[in-house]
């Protein structure tokens, strides 16, 4: 079972109950109807990245759906949190890519998103034997990775939120959702 398509999604939920907050975040991300199974960080060879609506059209309620899921929650008022997915796609579509998940507190969306993107790109770069200075800033390493001719694209999706002012549970999710076949 190798996914042939994948899509990114994100969402936020707020509720007095922690589990209900998570459910609302999944609803906001449009993936609450599925039995989600978290998997590790490999983007399969020849897996086409598609818009969320195209991917959702091939899934049916109750289906077992694999995804790389970033999830974070808090009931602390005004606490900033993030859930991010980073992706690195190789030039040669016959090779696999990497997906990373990142969950943090106190990071703005761009910081958390770029961290996840950097992590995925670095994991792919090390498997491809690309030499780089780990102390370089992300934007400098990104140029090294792309100049190598092995990494085609990197990107991220991030959901941030601040904890509900009244202390209700607030949840953020970001996910790379896989489509294996028409359900």
Curated annotation (Swiss-Prot):
Residues marked Cleavage (non-hydrolytic) (site): 40-41
Cofactor binding remark: Binds 1 pyruvoyl group covalently per subunit.
GO MF annotation terms: arginine decarboxylase activity
Enzyme Commission designation: 4.1.1.19
Enzyme class: lyase
Keyword Lyase among UniProt keywords: yes
Cofactor(s) the record lists: pyruvate
Keywords: Decarboxylase, Lyase, Pyruvate
BP terms from Gene Ontology: arginine catabolic process
Pfam families listed in its UniProt record: PvlArgDC
Modified residue annotations for Pyruvic acid (Ser): 41
InterPro entries reported for this sequence: Pyr-dep_his/arg-deCO2ase, Pyr-dep_his/arg-deCO2ase_sand, Pyruvoyl-dep_arg_deCO2ase
Record keyword Zinc-finger present: no
Catalysed reactions, semicolon-separated: L-arginine + H(+) = agmatine + CO2
Superkingdom of source: Archaea
UniProt record similarity statement: Belongs to the PdaD family.
Protein's UniProt name: Pyruvoyl-dependent arginine decarboxylase 2
């Amino acid at each position: 079972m190798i996914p042939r398509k994948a899509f990114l999604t994100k969402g936020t939920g707020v509720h007095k109950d922690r589990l209900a907050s998570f459910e609302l975040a999944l609803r906001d991300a449009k993936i609450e109807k599925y039995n989600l199974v978290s998997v590790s960080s490999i983007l399969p060879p020849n897996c086409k990245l598609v818009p969320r609506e195209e991917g959702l059209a091939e899934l049916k309620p109750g289906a077992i759906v694999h995804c790389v899921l970033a999830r974070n929650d808090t009931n602390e008022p005004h606490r900033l949190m993030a859930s991010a997915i980073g992706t690195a796609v190789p030039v040669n579509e016959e090779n696999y890519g990497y997906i990373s998940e990142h969950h943090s507190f106190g990071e703005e969306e761009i910081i958390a998103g770029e961290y996840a993107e950097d992590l995925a790109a670095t994991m792919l770069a090390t498997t491809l034997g690309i030499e780089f200075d780990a102390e370089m800033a992300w934007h400098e390493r990104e140029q090294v990775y792309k100049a190598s001719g092995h990494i085609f694209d990197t990107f991220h999706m991030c959901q941030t939120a601040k904890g509900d002012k009244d202390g209700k549970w607030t949840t953020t999710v970001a996910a790379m959702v896989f489509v294996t076949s028409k359900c």
